Regions:
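ATPase catalytic-site recognition across NTP-hydrolyzing enzymes
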Residues: 1-35
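Acidic two-metal-ion nuclease catalytic site recognized across multiple nuclease folds
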Residues: 3-13, 193-221
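Short acidic, Gly/Ser-rich segments with clustered Asp/Glu that frequently serve as metal-coordination loops
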Residues: 32-44
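Acidic active-site catalytic centers that drive phospho-/nucleotidyl reactions
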Residues: 36, 100, 184-187
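Short loop/turn segments immediately following beta-strands, especially the blade-tip
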Residues: 50-55
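Mg2+-dependent endonuclease catalytic cores in nucleic-acid-processing enzymes, primarily RNase H-like
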Residues: 56-178, 199, 215, 219-221
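Peripheral docking tails and interdomain loops at the edges
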Residues: 178-184
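Stable alpha-helical structural segments in soluble proteins, enriched in small hydrophobic residues
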Residues: 184-196
């Protein structure tokens, strides 16, 4: 069964690209996936996006978790990730997934998965190294990002209707002192946030917003 695509890639007259969600009518600057496979428990995958325009009151862009999934079988897990990737990728483009490329177990599973896909003439599934993955402080980097973006009064991280917020609330109270992959939801979400937290438009914010508003009203650009 074909996967229905809900994202369109649009480009302003000045060349600034953005993603348009056909279901919610939201406009994103970037969409990425975060993927964590711990081997000993369920793997976790998230799709998240950062708003194109800044919230002027918070002086920050909202980040939205669009989808999530967890699976215990690696092949089923990777197929779910691929399905989500197609669902949230615009036509003729593929959003990137970020994960722990230093994990021997995960990379071996991924290599086997892709060997089968190549044998059948299907495009492989690629995972890009997540930000701060090799940094000594990575155990705190990802949880700190989640705490920062969910703090009262300045919340910019928003979740779809899933169990992820409840899981995170309980887990973030604990001291995460082991491998980040021991906490797949933290890892997968953290990988995505690490990318989206640094996204900026190529054009200056006021210029982009003004251009968009002129396009909407039909006034000359």
């Amino acid at each position: 069964m074909d996967v229905i695509n809900i994202i369109e890639k649009k480009i302003y007259a000045d060349g600034e690209p953005y993603y348009f969600n056909l279901e919610t009518k939201e406009k994103y600057g970037e969409i990425v996936g975060g993927l964590a496979w711990p081997e000993t428990t369920d793997g976790f995958v998230v799709i998240a996006a950062v708003d194109l325009f800044e919230d002027t009151g918070l002086e920050a862009r909202h980040i939205r978790v669009l989808a999530e999934a967890n699976e215990s079988d690696i092949n089923t897990f990777l197929r779910r990730a691929l399905k989500l990737q197609r669902h949230f990728s615009p036509f003729m483009e593929t959003i990137r997934f970020y994960g722990d490329t230093t994990s021997p177990a995960m990379m071996e599973f991924l290599d086997q998965f892709n060997r089968d896909r190549r044998h059948r003439g299907i495009t492989p599934f690629y995972v890009t190294e997540a930000p701060q993955l090799k940094a000594p402080q990575k155990l705190e980097f990802y949880p700190q990002l989640i705490r920062k973006y969910t703090q009262s009064g300045r919340k910019i991280l928003h979740f779809c209707d899933t169990a992820l917020p409840g899981y995170l609330m309980g887990l973030l109270r604990e001291e995460i002192s082991r491998n980040i992959l021991d906490h797949p939801p933290i890892a997968a979400l953290g990988y995505a946030l690490g990318v989206l937290s640094t996204w900026k438009p190529r054009k200056r914010e006021p210029e982009v917003r003004a251009k968009y508003e002129r396009v909407l009203t039909g006034n000359p650009v």
